[in-house]
Amino acid sequence: MSRSHHKRLGMPRTWPLTRKTNIWAQKPNPSGHQLEMCMPLGIVLRDVLGIAHNMREAKRILHSRIVMVDGRIETDRARGVGIMDVLTVGDENYRCILDKNGKLRYRPIAKKAAGSKICRVMGKTTVKGGKTQVHLHDGRNILLDESPDYKTGDSLVISLPDQKVSSHLEMKKGSTAYLTGGSHIGEIAKIKDQE
């Protein structure tokens, strides 16, 4: 049986939490995001956004059903909120991104921007009936009737919460990229060349 907590000294470096104030930190439930690229919803409400003073208040906020992740109501405090996810608390909207120090941050965004999300294509498979299934970085699988020219590494802009593909962003020379690793983590750059 897996553990529901881990020690703060061993938590991922991307989490913007103090390590020596408490011993334990809630672990996110398994999801499509990697452990390093998401944080539990309860910790986000309590420690990052400061909406709740303790986990008991965070649970009450969640059970009042005013918190949404990617346009869907969430009541699980261990649900992982990962990179590019849209978090809505009441009338406030936030997007999870990486800052220049490699820490997960929740930046306020406009209501119009909260209706869409950018997802990276991690793979494609052909399923029964000749349909194409696209696998995205946050664990989503989108089934498409036609076979589009989506390649691994490209990004899709999907509308929330209905998950319809609204546009396709190719990874090619001259495109804009958001860096999620390396020494320039959290920066936006132009692709000069591709190997």
Question: Model segments located where?
Answer:
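Ferredoxin-like alpha/beta domains used as RNA- or RNAP-binding modules
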Residues: 1-195
